[in-house]
Amino acid sequence: LKGKMGNLVACNWRDIYYLRVKAKRSKKKPTKTQVSNRRGFGFVSTLLAPLRQFLLIQFKGYERGSDGMLSAQPYNYTNALIKTADGFDIDYRAARFCYGDLPGAQKASVVLKDENTLLITWSTEIKDLADHSDLLIWILACPAWNHLIAHEIQGSRKDGQLEVTIPPAMNLGVLHVQIAFKSLVNEKTSKSQYAGCIDFGRPAEAATTYAEDRTTAFCQASGISGALIKRVNLR
């Protein structure tokens, strides 16, 4: 059941179907607060847009019957959006890109093994629904390059560590790292958790077309989702 009939709109909430009256357009001029809120939500929506397919699956555990993408937007708007002097930013320590009730790791960290490689480590204890076979999801975010975000499922909980080759376009400024786990048994996901960050000390202006070309090649070779390429092209 969906669609419109006159001034009625068919809706769905938590698998419950109902009708509501179509909202009237307000002719009042929005307040400064309303304008700021809309811009902030637009910022978060633009940030997450390339991750739509990923979030539909990995964030669906936030609320039963809800759309993972539609849940991730208000969550990160409320918990991770930062208002700055010239616009908005994201607190990647508070942001979440996966959400579910599968247990995460008690500890997680990241160090730079060499100029091209990250070493992500995590504790391997298991409890409740967790299992040694749970797959690891890593998420990298580079604010210096228009909030470029890359992600991939690689490794498992029992490994305790994973080396990740840094995408060429992401060795600028500060690189934030999160991890999450995905169950092979019941497809549940854990909340993504902050592992740390690496400061490369190079500004975004250091990026070149060469870096963009290398990034495209990296994505094609590694199988990383198109989110990485799309975000590079946003610049």
Regions found by a protein language model. Give the residues of each.
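Charged linear interaction tracts used for macromolecular binding and regulation
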Residues: 65-232
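Long, polar/Ser/Thr-enriched low-complexity segments
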Residues: 1-105, 225, 229-235
